[in-house]
């Protein structure tokens, strides 16, 4: 079988797939396909995988060819379904594989990486493998895997969160400054206490005359001098 024929048939099959079911009558094939999740190989079909948005899940397939003729693995795809009503939520991007030839009675392995980015909920992952055999492309569904998908927890030290915190902090500080310049200054001017003027000690302690004062010939006020002292001065002058 020519590789160009395989790829042409593969492309034509993808173009005519409706809901990932081939058109025409279904055929029974003796090809066994299973897979494990590399990140959690202990999970079985009866377990529920727990994934976070942003995770990359690696499916490792094992294809056993029990047919009498050679088969070729040429692609892989899949879908996430609602496990309750079986409705398709999203389809996985179709990926090219190999092509990898599998002789009768032999098995091969290959990987598929899936980037998880869905609305947090419960899903069922159902992969599909494209097999080329006798110039025909066959789409073989694999077992389903139940999975719970949640959003990843945001770390306080996440650079995106730190940047957002800085932007909010700068914005908040800017609003406070503008508010103070517009209203704060005027408000504080109106409620701020007025400082009393200080009077110097010299002015505060100087006596204030309460009555008329007389000045003697000597040039000073004699009202405060005792009379006896003044009489003694006059007596001395007479003598």
From Swiss-Prot:
Where is the protein situated, by its record's location annotation?
Endoplasmic reticulum membrane
The record gives the membrane topology as:
Single-pass type I membrane protein
> Where are the Cytoplasmic topological domains?
183-239
| Compositionally skewed regions (Low complexity) per UniProt | 201-213
Q: What are the alphabetically sorted keywords of the record?
A: Endoplasmic reticulum, Membrane, Signal, Transmembrane, Transmembrane helix
Q: Where are the transmembrane segments?
A: 162-182
InterPro entries to which the protein is assigned, alphabetical: TRAP_alpha
Return the annotated region ranges for Disordered: 201-222
Keyword check for Transmembrane helix, yes or no: yes
Q: Does Calcium count among this protein's keywords?
A: no
Q: Which family does it belong to?
A: Belongs to the IRC22 family.
Q: What does this protein do?
A: Is probably involved in a pathway contributing to genomic integrity.
Q: By what name is this protein known?
A: Increased recombination centers protein 22-2
What is the organism of origin for this protein?
A: Candida albicans (strain WO-1) (Yeast)
